[in-house]
C-alpha cells in the first residue's frame, strides 16, 4: 500500500501535472502523527540503491513524511523548476532508451513502538493481511484495490481462521490518517517497479 497507493502520488511525474491526491500538501498533515516514511537511495548494497540518479544528482535519504507531516516529494531536475521544489536525486530510467522520470528507490515506513503481539491483542475484530497480491491504484485520487493472498481473521485479540478471496479497497490518504499503531518489526520486499521510464529495482518496507 505504501509504494502503490501513497508514494507514487509523491513522484513529481504526477504532482507537477496536478494528477496526485498529494498536490499542494507540503507542510500539511497527511498521515497519523506516528507515521514516518522515507525514500533512501543511499542504503549500502540495498536492491534499490543508487550512487547518483540518471541526471547525475547524488542519491540521498529523502524524508517524505515526518510525524504525519508531508515533508518532500520525489523530484527530478525537469520538474524542480515547475514545482519550485529542491531536486531529490530521484530521476531514474531503465536504460538510455527511456526518458528519465522521478522514481522511488528504497521506500519504507520507519519502525514504531508497538510489538506485533500488542497490535494483535488490541484488535477486537480485523484482518491480518500477511501477504498482498496484485491490484490497481488511481494516483489522482489515491483509491486502490489489492488482493489478499494470505490473510487471517483477528477476533478478540487473537489470530483465528484463514481468509480466502479477500480484497482490500480504500484510499491511500485515508489509510495514512487512520493508522493508530505501528510495529517495531520493519520488513522489506524486493521488486521491479514499472513506469514510463521503464522498470527499475526498488525496495518497499513497512512494519506491522
Segments predicted by a language model, with ranges:
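N-terminal small-residue-enriched
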Residues: 1-208
